[in-house]
C-alpha cells in the first residue's frame, strides 16, 4: 500500500513539473538538462514531455492548444491525463521535484539492471569479467546522468579560482599546490602532483623507475592521504621490501636475506608499525585491462574518500578494452581513459612507461618525448612527462662492451686487467655505499616550465634523494661508476 501511495505521489510530482513548464516555457531547458522523457514513471507524462520538447525545438508555445495539435495519432494521451496536467498547481521552484523524478528513475533502472545481472549470471556461456564490465559501464552511465549539474557561469568559476589563489597564499609561496613529489626542485617545476593530472614517468630498463615511484609513494602518504599502487610487474611484497629498505636504511640484500643485527631488527619493527598505519593499497595482478583499473579505483575511492593519488607500474603492461585493436590504438585508449579517470576522481594518476630501445643508438641517451613507446596518445594526454636518466648505467655498459671487444680482438691480458680494475671499483663503491647522480628530466609540463632536476640515487636502499642546487657534475663530465646493483 505504501508503495502504491508513493507511485501516486510521484505521478503528481511529474504533473506539477509539466504544469510548471506550461506556465513558464523557458523552464523546459532547465528540466531537460536533467530529465529525459524516459525518466518519467507514468508513460503519458513522459509523452507529454516529449511533445513539449518538440514544440520548444520548433520555437512554438508550449500550451494546451499546441500540445493537442502535436500529439501523434498512434500515441494519444487520454483526456483525463491531459486535464490532470493542466489542472496541477505549478510552483516556481521545481528543482527539488525534478531531482525527485530523476532519483526515482535511477532506482527503477537499478532494479532493472539487477534483474539483468541475475539473468546474465545464470548464463554459463558468458564470462564473469564480461558481465562485470557491462555492469560497470551501466552503473557509470547512471552516475554520469544522476546530477543536476551542467554548465557553470563565469562568476562561479572565478569565485572558485579566487578561493584557490587565497588558499595558496595562506599556505605560503613555498608550498606546493598539489601532492608533494618528494623532491623540492621537482616541486618547483610542477607545484606537486595536482588533482585531475595524468603524469607519465618514462625510462629505459634498469634506470630505476620503480624505485623512483616508491619514493614518491612514501612521500604522498603524508597528511593521512590514501595512495593506490597498481604493480603489474613486481609483487606487492617486493615493493613493501623496497619501502622498508628506504625507511630503515637497511640495504636490500641484507633485508632480503634476513641477516640483521639487533638494532636493525628494532628499527625494522618501528618502521613496520609506522607503515602499517598508512592508507597504502596495492593491486598486483600481472594482467589487467583498463576497465579493471577503472573499476578498482572507483571502488577504492568510494570506500576511502581520502584516496588522493594512484600509481601504475607500468602502462604498457595493461590491455585496452578490445584486444583486436592495434597496439598503438590500445595505448592511446589507455592513456585517454587514465586522464578521464584522473579528472573524474579528482586525483593525480602517475603512470610509468617503458621507452623505445632506439634511444640506445644515440650518442646522447637522455630521453626525449618521441622515445615513448606507441607514444602518440600518451604524449597528448599527459599533463606532465618526466624522464629518468642515470649516466653511470651507460658508462658501465660502455666498459663492459670495451672488455668484450678486447676479448674478441684477442687482447686477453688487457681485457683481464680492465675487468679486474672495473670490478674492484664497483666493489669498493658498493661497499662504501657511494651515491651517484641521476637526472629527472621534465620534458613536458602543461602548466609550467621544462628542465632538469638533479638527484642522488642510493642503490643499496633503492632510494632517490634531493640534491642541493648547483651541486651536480659539470656538463660533459662523466658520471662516476659506483656499484653493480641495477634496479628495475
Curated annotation (Swiss-Prot):
Recorded name of the encoding gene: dnaB
UniProt GO MF annotations: 5'-3' DNA helicase activity; ATP binding; ATP hydrolysis activity; DNA binding; DNA helicase activity; identical protein binding
Protein name (database record): Replicative DNA helicase DnaB
Biological source species: Helicobacter pylori (strain ATCC 700392 / 26695) (Campylobacter pylori)
Pfam family, one: DnaB
Positions contributing to ATP binding: 203-210
Activity regulation, short description: A C-terminal fragment of DnaG primase stimulates the helicase and ATPase activities and increases ssDNA binding.
Region entry ATPase domain, spans: 176-488
Region of interest (HPI), residue spans: 390-433
CDD domains noted in UniProt: DnaB_C (cd00984)
Domain SF4 helicase: 172-471
Free-text note on domains in this protein's UniProt record: Within each hexamer the N-terminal domains (NTD) form a ring, as do the ATPase domains; the 2 rings stack. The HPI (Helicobacter pylori insertion) forms a helix-turn-helix that protrudes from the ATPase domain; one side is positively charged while the other is negatively charged. The HPI inserts form a collar on the exterior of the ATPase domains. In the dodecamer (which has 4 layers) the homohexameric rings stack via their NTD rings.
Cofactor binding description: Mg(2+) is the preferred divalent cation for helicase activity; Mn(2+), Ca(2+) and Co(2+) will substitute but show less activity.
Record keywords: ATP-binding, DNA replication, DNA-binding, Helicase, Hydrolase, Isomerase, Magnesium, Nucleotide-binding, Primosome
Region of interest (N-terminal domain), ranges: 1-145
Any one GO biological process: DNA replication
Subunit note: Homohexamer. Dodecamer formed by 2 stacked hexameric rings. Binds ssDNA as a dodecamer in the presence of ATP, in the presence of non-hyrolyzable AMPPMP binds ssDNA as a hexamer. Binds DnaG primase; when the C-terminus of DnaG (residues 415-559) binds the dodecamer dissociates into a hexamer, which can bind up to 3 DnaG fragments.
Amino acid at each position: 500500500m505504501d508503495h502504491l501511495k508513493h507511485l501516486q505521489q510521484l505521478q503528481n510530482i511529474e504533473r506539477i513539473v509539466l504544469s510548471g513548464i506550461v506556465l513558464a516555457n523557458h523552464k523546459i531547458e532547465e528540466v531537460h538538462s536533467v530529465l529525459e522523457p524516459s525518466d518519467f514513471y507514468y508513460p503519458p507524462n513522459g509523452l507529454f514531455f516529449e511533445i513539449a520538447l518538440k514544440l520548444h525545438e520548433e520555437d512554438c508555445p508550449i500550451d494546451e492548444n499546441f500540445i493537442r495539435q502535436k500529439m501523434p495519432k498512434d500515441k494519444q494521451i487520454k483526456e483525463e491525463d491531459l486535464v490532470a496536467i493542466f489542472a496541477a498547481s505549478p510552483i516556481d521552484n521545481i528543482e527539488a521535484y525534478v531531482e525527485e523524478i530523476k532519483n526515482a528513475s535511477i532506482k527503477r533502472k537499478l532494479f532493472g539492471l539487477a534483474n539483468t545481472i541475475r539473468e546474465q549470471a545464470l548464463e554459463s556461456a558468458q564470462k564473469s569479467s564480461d558481465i562485470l564490465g557491462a555492469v560497470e559501464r551501466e552503473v557509470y552511465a547512471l552516475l554520469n546522468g544522476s546530477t543536476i549539474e551542467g554548465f557553470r557561469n563565469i562568476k562561479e568559476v572565478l569565485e572558485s579560482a579566487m578561493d584557490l589563489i587565497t588558499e595558496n597564499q595562506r599556505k605560503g609561496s613555498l608550498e606546493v599546490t598539489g601532492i608533494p613529489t618528494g623532491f623540492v626542485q621537482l616541486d618547483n617545476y610542477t607545484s606537486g602532483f595536482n588533482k585531475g593530472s595524468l603524469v607519465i614517468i618514462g625510462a629505459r630498463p634498469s634506470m630505476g623507475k620503480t624505485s623512483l615511484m616508491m619514493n614518491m609513494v612514501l612521500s604522498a602518504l603524508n597528511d593521512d592521504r590514501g595512495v593506490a599502487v597498481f604493480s603489474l610487474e613486481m609483487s606487492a611484497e617486493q615493493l613493501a621490501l623496497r619501502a622498508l629498505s628506504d625507511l630503515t636504511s637497511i640495504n636490500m640484500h641484507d633485508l632480503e636475506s634476513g641477516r640483521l643485527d639487533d638494532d636493525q631488527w628494532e628499527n625494522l619493527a618501528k618502521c613496520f608499525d609506522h607503515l602499517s598505519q598508512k592508507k597504502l593499497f596495492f593491486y598486483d595482478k600481472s594482467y589487467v585491462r583498463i576497465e579493471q583499473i577503472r573499476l578498482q579505483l572507483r571502488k577504492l575511492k568510494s570506500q576511502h574518500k581520502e584516496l588522493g593519488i594512484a600509481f601504475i607500474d607500468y602502462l604498457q603492461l595493461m590491455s585496452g578494452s578490445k584486444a583486436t585493436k592495434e597496439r598503438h590504438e590500445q595505448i592511446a585508449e589507455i592513456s585517454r581513459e587514465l586522464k578521464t579517470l584522473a579528472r573524474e576522481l579528482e586525483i593525480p594518476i602517475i603512470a610509468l612507461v617503458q621507452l623505445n630501445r632506439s634511444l640506445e643508438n644515440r650518442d646522447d641517451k637522455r630521453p626525449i618525448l618521441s622515445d615513448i613507446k606507441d607514444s602518440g596518445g600518451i604524449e597528448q594526454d599527459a599533463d606532465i612527462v618526466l624522464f629518468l636518466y642515470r649516466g653511470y648505467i651507460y658508462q658501465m655498459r660502455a666498459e663492459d662492451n670495451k672488455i668484450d671487444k678486447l676479448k674478441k680482438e684477442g687482447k686477453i691480458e688487457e681485457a683481464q686487467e680492465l675487468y679486474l680494475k672495473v670490478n674492484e671499483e664497483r666493489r669498493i663503491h658498493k661497499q662504501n655505499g657511494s651515491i651517484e647522480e641521476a637526472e629527472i628530466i621534465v620534458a613536458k609540463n602543461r602548466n609550467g616550465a621544462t628542465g632538469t632536476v638533479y638527484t642522488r640515487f642510493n642503490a643499496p636502499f633503492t632510494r632517490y634523494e634531493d640534491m642541493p642546487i648547483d651541486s651536480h657534475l659539470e656538463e660533459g663530465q662523466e658520471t662516476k661508476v659506483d656499484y653493480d646493483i641495477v634496479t628495475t
